[in-house]
């Protein structure tokens, strides 16, 4: 796993909340607002992490940067019920 993937996994395991791509980029890179490149790299790493560890990480994704959410599977299930 890469540095960004480890940071995402650490945030999700410790905070246990649902995060968006820009929220993760702010936490990982410590910059506000994050650049498009930072948000894109976090988005790619989050997709890769969700594919590698489906038992620990779940995602909701749609079109665009703002519709991506990642978190623990039980948190995503709660978030999906709340949104839909």
Where are these regions (language model features)?
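Short helix-capping/hinge SLiMs at alpha-helix to coil transitions
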Residues: 13-18, 31-32
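Short acidic, hydrophobic short linear motifs in intrinsically disordered regions
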Residues: 18-28
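Phospho-regulated, low-complexity intrinsically disordered regions of nuclear gene-regulatory
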Residues: 1-11, 34-48, 52-84
């Amino acid at each position: 796993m890469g540095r960004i993937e480890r940071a995402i996994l650490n945030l999700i395991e410790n905070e246990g909340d649902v995060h968006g791509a820009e929220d993760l980029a702010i936490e990982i890179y410590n910059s506000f607002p994050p650049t498009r490149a930072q948000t894109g790299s976090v988005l790619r790493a989050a997709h890769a992490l969700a594919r590698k560890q489906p038992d620990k990480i779940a995602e909701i994704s749609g079109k665009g940067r703002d519709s991506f959410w990642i978190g623990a599977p039980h948190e995503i299930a709660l978030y999906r019920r709340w949104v839909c």
